[in-house]
């Protein structure tokens, strides 16, 4: 998902340091032109008539040779797909310094970079070697550059916050990025995610996997849904070296709510939208939600926490395979959490299409929430992969577990709407990306109250 990001200070990027800092920088220097070649030719001198001896004349200056035409720069994507010069410069340096082989000697004018659209929390770029450059070993020809979004290094949304509070926010942001990077590296080593090529305070370099992200409509396809369920069950079964207490869900919502209650907008339309959202008495609503979910059994597992179509890759060349054609990516929100949230959140994402190209740059359709039949299809694929002895249970026992799980995930779907609703209000304040964050927040809270009515809670 897309947000404002910092690209560091004026110095060249360094792998050292944890805290991000926004600074100024300069544009990349223009590429030089080729050197002019010199040439000379020997011409015979002419003899003069009369009695005088012939004089040796100095040779005339060499005939001018045509200047070689400057070599055109490597083809680049259209201007609207190019990052700003400062970001391009830093991307080049990161690739040159962190990647081996041909990247080490790559000239800046040979460097290819283009923006990858579609995220809402990070800025993504594809960086590549030119076609004319041969690799020297097994180094990648293409990599993915991820620059962290503001939400990971979130500072207070209001400048009047105390210096101590600002320092705490900076520390928490740095801690979140360190944990996320460790998590990414572990998943890469276990072949459950892309390879990690480089890491630095502002982001990282990842394996570029030939693939495409799923479309929202594909989430409901039976074979796709079944494999997502199996992948999620595998994710939930992992043992990770992180805090096992399920603090993430309500801890994150409380942090976002604290920021939301302090946010001040100057734009009239945003003021009105915020006033409407605050009229829901969000602190009381959060306490009621907490009470409901505390009474809802749900195992604590290692959760992805953002399993939406943009974070699921359909691998190139495996489109027609029955299984193993998908890969989960983007683990920045992953943590130990309640299983019901991860699945309920995924079901909520069936309703939202983030590929819409006009304001507010998303479409919501509450009727796309999975039916009971679709939910049971997902759960029926999930449970055998999650619970080893599930297939040995009786039909009646299986039915009871499935019904309990339906209640679990549909209640925790409420938390998904509440969390991302608050998140979007915060993004409206701190993000520089063109997206209707306040409209999205309203859509999520509309769905939250709709889900409450359906559940009768």
UniProtKB/Swiss-Prot annotation:
The UniProt entry lists the main location of this chain as cytoplasm
GO MF annotation terms: ATP binding; choline kinase activity; cholinesterase activity; ethanolamine kinase activity; protein homodimerization activity; protein tyrosine kinase activity
Pathway in which the depicted protein is active: Phospholipid metabolism; phosphatidylcholine biosynthesis; phosphocholine from choline: step 1/1; Phospholipid metabolism; phosphatidylethanolamine biosynthesis; phosphatidylethanolamine from ethanolamine: step 1/3
Which InterPro entries does this chain map to? Answer: Kinase-like_dom_sf (IPR011009)
GO terms (BP aspect): CDP-choline pathway; cellular response to glucose starvation; lipid droplet disassembly; lipid metabolic process; lipid transport; phosphatidylcholine biosynthetic process; phosphatidylethanolamine biosynthetic process
- Which residues are recorded with the post-translational modification N6-acetyllysine? 247
Q: Where is the composition biased (Low complexity)?
A: 13-32
Annotated segments matching region Disordered? 1-86
Family the entry assigns: Belongs to the choline/ethanolamine kinase family.
Summary of subunit composition and partner proteins: Homodimer. Heterodimer with CHKB.
User: What name does the UniProt record give this protein?
Assistant: Choline kinase alpha
